[in-house]
Amino acid sequence: MLSIENEKRIEKWIEDHKEEFIADLSKIIAVPSVATPGVSEGEFPFGIESANVLAAAKEIVEGYGFPVKNLDNYCLVANVGEGEEKIGLFGHLDVVPCGNDWNYPPYQLTVDGDLLIGRGILDDKGPLWASIFAVRCLKDLDLMPKREIEIFMGGQEECGMNDLLHYIEVSEKLPDVSFTPDGNYPICHGEKGGLRFYLAIPCSDEKIVDFKGGTVKNVVADKAVATLKNVCAECL
């Protein structure tokens, strides 16, 4: 348990680094980072956008004094502290497509009162960056646990998680316990899975030519469009 004195030290550290946090996070938000599904041959397994955000994050995190490894443009790994046991901190830098009709520019961090707005601010660039700063705080204040902390920054969580599979394949030692800042409270112990399916139904109405909406499966559709024929405007 932290002492009251250390709690105050942490609060002061957070306040002193708030502007730096927002400035660095804005650089990450500014990088479009929609990953491609599957695994492509060559230098960029998840496309150039995913590789770009990994490169941007690596440069910034190395500036904090953390050694960072780029695992073949699948993900980044930063290791901090020492110990026989390892704590894994898992987040991702790829995002889902933006869609249309944003009230704010999606790839520009907007500060509106106490709100931070931008694509990935909640899933998962913002929480991941807050966690990185939390590790910085522990390190700067000499409050690190007697364990190594390994920060995983993924490049393809939204459409396959091949970044995590590659990490598992090439890692010499996996974490003993892990935490992922990729969800709202309350804390959950696990996720049973997700259901994605195709539904086909017969349609006897010849007026409907086409019906579609959305861009990818894991995003709420911003609009739906139907193409009709032989329908008068008054009937709609």
Language-model regions, residue ranges each:
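Active-site metal-coordination/substrate-binding segment of hydrolases
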Residues: 86-153, 159
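N-terminal helical capping/dimerization or prosegment-like subdomains
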Residues: 2-88, 95-98
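Conserved beta-strand termini and adjacent loop/short-helix elements that scaffold enzyme active sites
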Residues: 71-73, 154, 211
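Short coil/turn connectors at secondary-structure junctions
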Residues: 83-87, 112-113, 145-149, 173-176, ...
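Midchain, well-structured core segments that form catalytic/ion-binding scaffolds
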Residues: 158, 162-236
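A structural signal for short hydrophobic beta-strand segments in well-ordered beta-sheet cores
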Residues: 68, 109-111, 199
